[in-house]
Amino acid sequence: AMVSFLHYWALTEFIGLADHLGEWEDAKKYKAAAQHVKEVCNRELWDGEWFIRGITASGRKIGCQEDAEGRVHLESNAWAVLSGAADAEKADAALQAIDEYLYTPYGLLLNTPSYTVPDDDIGFVTRVYPGLKENGAIFSHPNPWAWAAACVRGRGDLAMKFYDALCPYWQNDKIEFRESEPYSYCQFIAGKDHSAYGRARHPFMTGSGGWSYFAATRYMLGIRPDYDELKIDPCIPADWKSFRATRVFRGASYEIIVNNPDGVMKGVKEIRIDGVPSDRIKPSRTGSRHVVEVTL
C-alpha cells in the first residue's frame, strides 16, 4: 500500500513539473493517472479505521481489523496522508489510528501487535523477533513521515508530540537503559512487545537523521523551496508564540521571523519582505540578505 501512495505522490510531483514547464499534455495525462490511483487506493486499501499495509500474492489483506497480529502499520497510513491520496475524512482517521495504536513515549511503532507466528504468505517480517527491527519496534526512519503527515492535516500539536517522542535529547535521563547517545537517532528502539522496551540500537545507522531534518524544516517549520519561490507555511503547536530561522535560497539569505499572535497551528495571514507586504518570496540576487516576517 505504501508504494501505491508513493506512486500517487510521484504523479502529483510530475504534474507540478509539467505545469511549470508548460507541458500541458503531460500534465493532463498525469492528472488522469493520479485521479485513478487515488480512487483505487481509497476504495481498495481502506479498512474502516485505517489503511491496510498491503495485499499478499494470494489476495489476503495485511494490516486489517481482522488480523490478530500486525493489525496497524505506520508506513501505509503515514504515506496515505502525506501523499494527499487519502480523502480528508480517511486521512484524519489514519492519523488518529497512528496516535492511538502506534504512539509510545519513545516514538511510533512500525506495526502492532508484533508477529509471533511465522507466516510465509506475509513474509520475512513474521520471522523477526517480536518487538525488534521490522517486527513491532520503534523503527526510526518512518517516524518523520508521520510528523509531515500531521502537518499536511494542520495538526501541529500531533506533529510535535510525535517529534518529541523520538527525539534522542529527551531520552538522555534514561541513558543507562537506552544505551545510546543523546545526539544520534538510532535505527530502532525495542518495541512494547519486547522485554527491553525503550532500549535503542544501531545509532547513526539510519536514514532518520535526514528525514527528521526534512520533516521538521519543510513541514513543521514549513520552509521549503519551490520552482519559482520560497514557500513558508508552518504547522506548529498552538502555544508556540514565534520562531526564527535562516534559510539560504538560490544564493540569497533570508532571516525568517514567524509570529503566532492568535495561537493557531497553521495558516499564513501575512508575509512581509523587508517590511513590504508580499504574497510570494521570489528568488533574489545572489549574496543579498532579506528579513521575512510571517504572521499566522
Positions of predicted regions on the chain:
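Charge-dense, low-complexity intrinsically disordered segments
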Residues: A1, L21-W24, K28, K133, ...
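Amphipathic alpha-helical repeat scaffolds
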Residues: W79-L82, P144-A148
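Amphipathic, soluble alpha/beta structural segments
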Residues: N111-N143, A245
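Functionally constrained cores in energy, signaling, and assembly domains
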Residues: A1, H7-Y8, F14, A18, ...
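Catalytic cores of carbohydrate-active enzymes
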Residues: L6-I122, D164, P168-A196, V248, ...
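Secondary-structure capping and boundary motifs in well-ordered enzyme cores
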Residues: V3-L6, A33, C64-L74, A86-K90, ...
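Non-catalytic C-terminal accessory modules of carbohydrate-active enzymes
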Residues: E100-T104, V128-N135, W145-L296
